[in-house]
Amino acid sequence: MGSPNSLFEVESFLKNMFNDPLILGIKNTFARKMLASFITHSRVEETKKNYQAIGGKSPLTAHTLNLTNKLNELDCKRFYTYAMRYTPPFAYQVLEDIKTQGIQSVVLFSLYPQFSYSTIASSLIDAKAALQKLAFTPTLYEISSYHTHPDYISCIIERIKESLGADNPNEFVLLLSAHSLPQSRIDEGDPYQKQCEENKEVIQKALESEGIVFKKIALAYQSKVGRMKWIGPSTKETITKYKKHKMIIFPLSFTLDNSETEYELKILYASLAKELNVPQYRVCSCFNDNERFAKSIMNILEEHLRGKAEV
């Protein structure tokens, strides 16, 4: 979806995000722009402070670039690049470059493992609109969900084991923290929450198959905005609930570190854990340009192309 590459991009990032009809769910363009402007104005300074706390920008773009570089190193058969939804590089710019190169087959691969209309569908619509504007008609494939794929799950298990080290898992609560969504989106049929729950079950089985049994594996949701009801329980509530236990946090809905992992999990909720005297609070890093994750993308891609027709 993108993140600000500097404090100067924070305002435009927020405007672009809240003006997306799949984010606010308002079809009337004028009304949506007015509300997006109001929300942006009310949040921009606080958001800038959050980014200042992690160095003045999101690490997302750098991690994404490093991942695509890793993929290009590992797979000489294809050209890997990336586009963002709300900050540069936008889909139009990237697809224009791909068209110029004479590439005739394009795979749209989401770096969100679980499907949601607010994130993945929005990005796919944006990319297809760009293709139409460019009069570019490549053979098109899309990979929009892989939350239970064994290669992806193995990357998660590796990160959890790294965080656990030689310690006894039975002394820890494993908290899988996913980005939240408004409850109304789930009620309308968005499969995101169901896929997060499926993701949790597969992770638990994979850990148990290796003899790794945590005191508790909990699923919670972070990053709520506004007053409407969002899916829960919240990450804050769950940390508070298990405050007497050692805790490992895994960022379930992110494959690349960003403000939600670097600020919310590693600063905001780490501070909460300290206030609550949580015995140990550890946050797993996202995969970023980890070679195992890059190879899992390649494997998922290969399997998809062997078994699926074009869009």
From Swiss-Prot:
The enzyme's E.C. designation: 4.98.1.1
GO biological process, one term: heme biosynthetic process
PROSITE patterns for this protein: FERROCHELATASE
Catalytic activity: heme b + 2 H(+) = protoporphyrin IX + Fe(2+)
GO molecular function: ferrochelatase activity; metal ion binding
Highest taxon, organism lineage: Bacteria
Pathway stated in the Swiss-Prot or TrEMBL entry: Porphyrin-containing compound metabolism; protoheme biosynthesis; protoheme from protoporphyrin-IX: step 1/1
Binding-site positions, Fe cation: 179, 260
A Pfam family annotated for this UniProt entry: Ferrochelatase
Protein's cellular compartments: Cytoplasm
Alphabetical keyword list: Cytoplasm, Heme biosynthesis, Iron, Lyase, Metal-binding, Porphyrin biosynthesis
Transcription regulation in keyword set: no
GO cellular component entries: cytoplasm
UniProt similarity note: Belongs to the ferrochelatase family.
PANTHER family, alphabetized: FERROCHELATASE, FERROCHELATASE, MITOCHONDRIAL
Function, as annotated: Catalyzes the ferrous insertion into protoporphyrin IX.
Protein name: Ferrochelatase
Organism this protein belongs to: Helicobacter hepaticus (strain ATCC 51449 / 3B1)
Lineage: Bacteria, Pseudomonadati, Campylobacterota, Epsilonproteobacteria, Campylobacterales
The gene coding this protein: hemH
